[in-house]
A protein has these predicted regions:
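P-loop NTP-binding module
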Residues: 1-185
Length: 185
């Protein structure tokens, strides 16, 4: 995570301020972070924005739902043994999968690799899980697989209250961006 007083940190603080207004207006607690392709900075943006909210006293939970491209555990040198997929498949309890990374900042890793299907993500399990977690956290940020490699965003859209679409300057093609925007609406 970057120093929030650095130039990049100040940029994340500006994004956080804009996001804070949208969250307050929509009364959203569950925000998905998504990109078009892998390696566009989605996970980095998510973690730094989550950290900026945690730094002002918001109790934040980050969930890695990018099962095929799971990386959030690596930022904290954590194992990816038990996580979201294990909770969904009833192989682990929620409390077993929540890891405290710092004050006000918890993480649920993606867990073992599985194929998210309509039967898993469309089930009430994720909805019930998020309802339970919303009682404990001010904000829940969900790391969602890129739109070009997965339809997870569509499968999770019924439980995610808003999306942040992260693009990489001079890399994300405008046609792909248009497709992603259509995909999310």
């Amino acid at each position: 995570l970057i120093d929030l007083n650095s130039e990049a940190g100040k940029a994340y603080q500006k994004i956080k301020a804009s996001l804070e207004v949208a969250i307050r207006e929509k009364k959203s607690k569950v925000i998905g972070f998504i990109s078009v392709n892998h390696n566009e900075g989605k996970s980095t943006a998510l973690l730094n924005i989550a950290n900026s909210f945690a730094s002002i006293g918001k109790k934040v939970l980050v969930i890695d739902a990018d099962n095929k491209g799971a990386s959030l555990h690596l930022y904290f040198a954590l194992p990816n043994e038990k996580g979201l997929s294990d909770i969904i498949l009833d192989d682990a309890k929620v409390d077993e999968c929540i890891v405290s990374t710092s004050q006000n900042f918890d993480l649920i890793t993606s867990g073992k690799e599985v194929e998210y299907t309509d039967s898993i993500s469309g089930s009430d399990k994720i909805s019930k899980l998020l309802d339970e977690l919303k009682e404990k956290y001010d904000l829940i940020f969900v790391n969602v697989a890129p739109t070009k490699s997965s339809n997870d965003a569509v499968l999770l859209a019924h439980v995610i209250e808003g999306f942040v679409l992260v693009i990489k300057r001079k890399s994300t093609k405008s046609t792909d961006l248009d497709d992603a925007l259509k995909y999310l609406t």
